[in-house]
Amino acid sequence: MEELGVKRRIVLVPVPAQGHVTPIMQLGKALYSKGFSITVVLTQYNRVSSSKDFSDFHFLTIPGSLTESDLKNLGPFKFLFKLNQICEASFKQCIGQLLQEQGNDIACVVYDEYMYFSQAAVKEFQLPSVLFSTTSATAFVCRSVLSRVNAESFLLDMKDPKVSDKEFPGLHPLRYKDLPTSAFGPLESILKVYSETVNIRTASAVIINSTSCLESSSLAWLQKQLQVPVYPIGPLHIAASAPSSLLEEDRSCLEWLNKQKIGSVIYISLGSLALMETKDMLEMAWGLRNSNQPFLWVIRPGSIPGSEWTESLPEEFSRLVSERGYIVKWAPQIEVLRHPAVGGFWSHCGWNSTLESIGEGVPMICRPFTGDQKVNARYLERVWRIGVQLEGELDKGTVERAVERLIMDEEGAEMRKRVINLKEKLQASVKSRGSSFSSLDNFVNSLKMMNFM
């Protein structure tokens, strides 16, 4: 990296949410290993701690940014719009101060696509900027397509039950109802977000936490449409592991797993944002119990409306779960998926969880909640054929059957073979001369060109 001269610092700007923080910190680890200094610019909400895992990183907090109470009061979309409004000026000050203190050493600013306030600062200081997408390439394609649809016509289509089950033109095998809309706000708001992020996009390049062995056609579409270099350098959790959980992990579950039979356990975790009604949790508990399979269940505090944790659930729930299950508030997910006792993963299908499950060779039960999770679930079931998707209302019979299909049936055995094959391809992609390894090297070389042209 000596040839980079003094421009050896990369500034990272993450969205303050678990699913966005984790991959951008992994990206930071990967770039640090290439000889760059890393500065992470955070908001006051969900700040990453400067732990031993990131002791070589420099952390800055944008003054006056929003807090957790603002998120609760505004909701996710208004929060995001306001965050971009109020952070623009303070981020400019932050970058200006960095340039002054560090001797003009910034090679580029890498920002999460939803933190588009970064663009004003990089334009003012004439810095290279790189957009980082934490979702699949296919979900990125969907957002790009949706940013250009006729909003009025699309809203009518989405409200028509006859249309929602139809395949969306040009996005096979995705249906209208699989598109990345949100459970956290009206469709109009999500379309506005997509429009804002696309219209303001002036980045010199795009980094995606994916790999060509999973999404070659979507990556090719993006490379053609975006007209800037696209670098698929994932899966980052394999290429550059970097623990960055915003919740405390309960490691006692690993001891419980040690007592279970190989490939027998269903691991259930619905991510850091999904909410569940009591009736759905009871149907899950009954179905899991009736499947006669042991299960490890992550129930996140606050995920049950009106309850801090599980205390508001009926006694029947605790009895059902205690017979063959184990509940924790949060788990060390990659270690759990890697454990030989785990035979399946019931997931919300967030992109990080999807990559982690494939990366450990674990087939999935898919229950998407919002956004790009629906895209991922459809691909898991129909394209990669390593998942069983649960659609519609949950009932114990459907749950029991899904577990049986995954753990006991020949269908599940075939899924396991396919996911192990994908696991091997993912691992190969991040090794020397693999596609993602080479893509990261190409990105580093492009930074040299950005700073010496």
UniProtKB/Swiss-Prot annotation:
The keyword Protein biosynthesis does not apply. It comes from the Eukaryota. UDP-alpha-D-glucose binds at residues 272, 331-333, 348-356, 370-373. Its EC number is 2.4.1.-. It is an enzyme of class 2 (transferase). InterPro entries: UDP_glucos_trans (IPR002213). Keywords: Glycosyltransferase, Transferase. GO terms for molecular function: quercetin 3-O-glucosyltransferase activity; quercetin 7-O-glucosyltransferase activity. Possesses low quercetin 3-O-glucosyltransferase and 7-O-glucosyltransferase activities in vitro. Belongs to the UDP-glycosyltransferase family. This is UDP-glycosyltransferase 76E1. It comes from Arabidopsis thaliana.
